[in-house]
Amino acid sequence: MAARLCCQLDSARDVLLLRPFGPQSSGPPFPRPAAGSAASSTSSPSPSDESDLPLGRLPACFASASGPCCLVFTCADLRTMDSTVNFVSWHAKRQLGMPSKDLWTPYIKDQLLTKWEEGSIDPRLSIFVLGGCRHKCMRLL
């Protein structure tokens, strides 16, 4: 499993802060990718590049029609890390009204990230921890 990252949206500077989760939680902020940016190849980054991954680099399974694999995202309030939950399961329970899984990708790209930016998402996810999976990384469109 990949290293875990603490992600925090800094709306004052319009950046997403990606920091290693652990005793040393410092790291440079990465700007969010511009809408409509070109997709890159799906090759896996080298270990030396992993600390400089932009926000748009997500596992390829993130945008699959069936949703991300169960190892991709684990979310938790940092105050209660002993009770982490799988993001996919947590989100599915909140979105029981969605007609099909075909809407997963547009929902994540448009609605979820917009809600996060506007600050109207559940406070439990305002700070969350990402895990990794075996899938190669890709850049969001």
Curated annotation (Swiss-Prot):
Primary site of residence: host cell
Keyword set, alphabetical order: Activation of host NF-kappa-B by virus, Activator, Apoptosis, Host cytoplasm, Host G2/M cell cycle arrest by virus, Host mitochondrion, Host nucleus, Host-virus interaction, Modulation of host cell cycle by virus, Transcription, Transcription regulation
Gene Ontology terms: biological process: DNA-templated transcription; symbiont-mediated activation of host NF-kappaB cascade; symbiont-mediated arrest of host cell cycle during G2/M transition; viral genome replication
Post-translational modification remark: A fraction may be phosphorylated in insect cells and HepG2 cells, a human hepatoblastoma cell line. Phosphorylated in vitro by host protein kinase C or mitogen-activated protein kinase. N-acetylated in insect cells.
Protein's cellular compartments: Host cytoplasm; Host nucleus; Host mitochondrion
One Pfam entry name: X
Region (Mitochondrial targeting sequence): 68-113
Highest taxon, organism lineage: Viruses
Annotated Gene Ontology cellular component terms: host cell mitochondrion; host cell nucleus
Chain residue ranges for the region called Disordered: 24-52
Low complexity composition-biased segments: 33-48
InterPro entries, A to Z: Transactivation_prot_X
Subunit record text: May form homodimer. May interact with host CEBPA, CFLAR, CREB1, DDB1, E4F1, HBXIP, HSPD1/HSP60, NFKBIA, POLR2E and SMAD4. Interacts with host SMC5-SMC6 complex and induces its degradation. Interacts with host TRPC4AP; leading to prevent ubiquitination of TRPC4AP. Interacts with host PLSCR1; this interaction promotes ubiquitination and degradation of HBx and impairs HBx-mediated cell proliferation.
Record-stated family: Belongs to the orthohepadnavirus protein X family.
UniProt function note: Multifunctional protein that plays a role in silencing host antiviral defenses and promoting viral transcription. Does not seem to be essential for HBV infection. May be directly involved in development of cirrhosis and liver cancer (hepatocellular carcinoma). Most of cytosolic activities involve modulation of cytosolic calcium. The effect on apoptosis is controversial depending on the cell types in which the studies have been conducted. May induce apoptosis by localizing in mitochondria and causing loss of mitochondrial membrane potential.
Designated name of the protein: Protein X
Organism, scientific name: Woodchuck hepatitis B virus (isolate 59)
Upper lineage: Viruses, Riboviria, Pararnavirae, Artverviricota, Revtraviricetes
Encoding gene, per UniProt annotation: X
